[in-house]
């Protein structure tokens, strides 16, 4: 976990084999991987320092404790960009990329993610090379003068709501509202998405493809 270069492999579920490997000189702890809904992109997260350090300060490198976004082209990983929640945090706020999930909006790639005491950030990575933040929530430090571990461990989207598990303060529940970045129709579509196969249950780590009701079916 202390290495700055780590390899990752992609697997086919029914017949696993390594398709490609990547390294990132800024990454310390390759923590998780999240595919977009159609499986053409993947987000890798770097939980720098195991999540217990302040790595979102104004002077911290933008590839420390960040996301790395890759397009999948001919079963190969092609690096496109890094993403780090943009608001600088205090030295008393542990802050790195952590658990999140896709918000299933047709023809777009939207990801909600926990950043410990950095709060939550909703990222639009439809353009893999230019990800942007389209929504956020940040409580501020638990203690202003002392760094203690806290903040969001995970933020998961499910049928219209974002559930944030805050280590010290409990569970927060959020609802998306229309904005210049998200329309009322897109928010409704995300709420109505369901698994392409199998029962209508949710486990963010399964990352099953989602589909939407056809027009006039509701």
List the predicted regions and their residue ranges.
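A structural motif specific to WD40 beta-propellers
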Residues: 17-20, 78-80, 131-134, 182
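Conserved blade-ending motifs and adjacent loop-strand segments that build the rim/top face
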Residues: 23-29, 82-98, 130-157, 194
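Flexible loop/turn segments at secondary-structure boundaries
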Residues: 26-29, 50-53, 90, 119-121, ...
């Amino acid at each position: 976990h202390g290495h700055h270069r780590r390899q990752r492999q992609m697997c086919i579920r029914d017949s696993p084999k390594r398709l490609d490997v990547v390294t990132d000189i800024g990454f310390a702890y390759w923590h998780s991987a999240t595919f977009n809904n159609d499986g053409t992109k993947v987000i890798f997260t770097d939980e720098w320092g195991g999540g217990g350090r302040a790595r979102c300060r104004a002077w911290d490198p933008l590839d420390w404790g960040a996301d790395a976004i890759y397009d999948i082209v001919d079963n190969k990983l092609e690096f496109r960009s890094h993403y780090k929640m943009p608001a600088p945090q205090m030295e008393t706020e542990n802050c790195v990329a952590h658990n999140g999930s896709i918000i299933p909006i047709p023809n777009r790639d939207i990801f909600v993610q926990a950043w410990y005491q950095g709060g939550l950030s909703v990222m639009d990575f439809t353009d893999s090379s230019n990800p942007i933040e389209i929504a956020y929530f940040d409580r501020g430090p638990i203690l202003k003068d002392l760094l203690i571990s806290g903040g969001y461990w995970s933020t998961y989207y499910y049928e219209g709501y974002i559930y944030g598990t805050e280590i010290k303060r409990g569970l927060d529940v959020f609802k998306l509202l229309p904005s210049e970045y998200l329309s009322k129709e897109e928010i409704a579509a995300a709420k109505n998405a369901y698994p392409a196969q199998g029962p209508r249950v949710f486990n963010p780590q399964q990352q099953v493809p989602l589909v939407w009701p056809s027009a006039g079916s509701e």
